[in-house]
Design a protein with these regions (language model features):
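Glycine-rich phosphate-binding/hydrolytic loop that grips phosphoryl groups
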Residues: 174, 185-202
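Acidic, Mg2+-coordinating phosphoryl-transfer loop and its flanking beta/alpha structural elements
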Residues: 135, 146-181, 185
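Cytosolic catalytic headpiece
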Residues: 1-42, 139-148
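A short acidic, helix-capping loop that chelates divalent metal ions and anchors anionic groups
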Residues: 3-6, 10, 118-121, 176
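Alpha-helical scaffold elements within enzyme catalytic domains, especially in hydrolases
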Residues: 26-27, 101-102, 175
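Short, hinge-like loop/turn segments at secondary-structure boundaries
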Residues: 12-14, 52-56, 127, 186-187, ...
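Predominant activation on well-ordered alpha-helical scaffold segments within soluble catalytic domains
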Residues: 25, 136, 193-197
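Conserved acidic, metal-coordinating active-site core of Asp-based
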Residues: 22, 37-150, 154, 159
Length: 202
């Protein structure tokens, strides 16, 4: 999603089609119970069944405490409600890797170890939903000539590959660093903010 910060108008959106329901059923049958992001009655929410949450999911939810998008539901069927656009699975690699292999060619999938919690994640999105695709559309809308990006995870790789310059924070995933123009200070050291302060007038 790309949203105008002032008007809160959605500028770019990519939703799953109804085939996502069969994906969710497949996850459930493999004892994987995700957090599902959707627009429900025109309001963004992320839904989950608390009793099905893994330790990693509970850690994530704790980090989002107070988030108005939080939507705890009581049944798996409720995870299918609304216009789904993003699925997050946080579970054991032996459960997630086969699902990544199964869906990586049909959807935009990111399989990675979270650099902050060391938990294994599988993210599933519509095929068109990537940072690089969103940036291409924004570049066209804004008539941008130069692209500088910052990142820390494997889901930033496609964005790094298309940028004029790309900067990975020191605590970034090692797979991302190999695509970086330069490695800057870590998130804990406010690396991005410090880089912008030093370079934004160039």
């Amino acid at each position: 999603f790309v949203i105008d910060n002032i008007t809160e108008k959605i500028l770019i959106a990519n939703y799953f089609d109804d085939s996502v329901h069969s994906v969710l059923e497949d996850l459930f049958s493999n004892n994987v119970y995700p957090i599902v992001y959707a627009y429900i009655d025109n309001v963004e929410k992320f839904s989950f069944v608390r009793k099905m949450c893994t330790e990693g999911m509970n850690m994530f939810l704790e980090s989002r405490k107070g988030d108005v998008r939080t939507n705890e539901v009581n049944s798996l069927s409720e995870l299918k409600e609304g216009n789904n656009f993003y699925i997050t699975c946080i579970d054991e690699p032996k459960k997630l890797m086969p699902l990544y292999d199964k869906y990586k060619d049909k959807y935009h999938c990111v399989y990675q170890t979270d650099i902050y919690t060391n938990e294994q994640w599988l993210e599933i999105m519509p095929l068109e939903a990537s940072k690089s695709n969103a940036i291409k559309q924004l570049q066209s809308m804004l008539n941008c000539e130069k692209l500088i990006v910052f990142g820390d995870g494997k889901n930033d790789i496609d964005m790094f590959q298309m940028a004029d310059k790309s900067y990975a924070v020191a605590n970034a995933h090692n797979d991302l660093k190999q695509f970086a123009t330069e490695v800057i200070l870590s998130n804990d050291e406010d690396g991005v903010a410090r880089w912008l302060e030093a370079n934004y007038k160039q």
